[in-house]
Amino acid sequence: NLNALRDWGHARDYVEMMWLMLQQDKPDDYVIATGHQYSVRDFITTAAKHLGITIAWQGEGVDEVGIIDAFDESIIAEKLINEGTDKDFIARTQLSHLKDIAREVALNPRLKPGNVIVRVSPHYFRPTEVETLLGDPSKAHEKLGWQPKVKFAELVQEMMDNDFIEARRECLCKHAGFSVAAYID
């Protein structure tokens, strides 16, 4: 459900709050949340932007789709070649493979403006789906002085960076002739 609203928060912030709770002289109940909501659509839009993809949304409900409005392939190429990897290691072993992969990504016909890259699947709808989840952390703010540090866009970026490192590793293995397990879901 692309309209589902969630209170997205980072585990690092939540663990800090738990630690602060444990430092209190007297036990008490607190809501661990950011107090801010974003839709699943917001999450997808932010994640795609991190990869240089701008999504235009069309339709409603199960007929809603996300269509590539624009794609700046230089962003993925930059991430492939420069992010999260030891530069000396790249220089010795991976650079030519990564450049080949970056070219393949740029030429991928599925990543062209006008193509659908997000489609709602009724398979994932839950009969008891809660449309909106929002916590009120005001007591934690007041009594513990706790504030979440990681903003929504940073959370999405961190998740995308981690997934991108894994995907890059798989691409390098495939490009070098190794078999890679297929993942579904």
PLM region descriptions:
Residues 1-185:
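C-terminal substrate-binding subdomain of Rossmann-fold SDR/epimerase-dehydratase oxidoreductases
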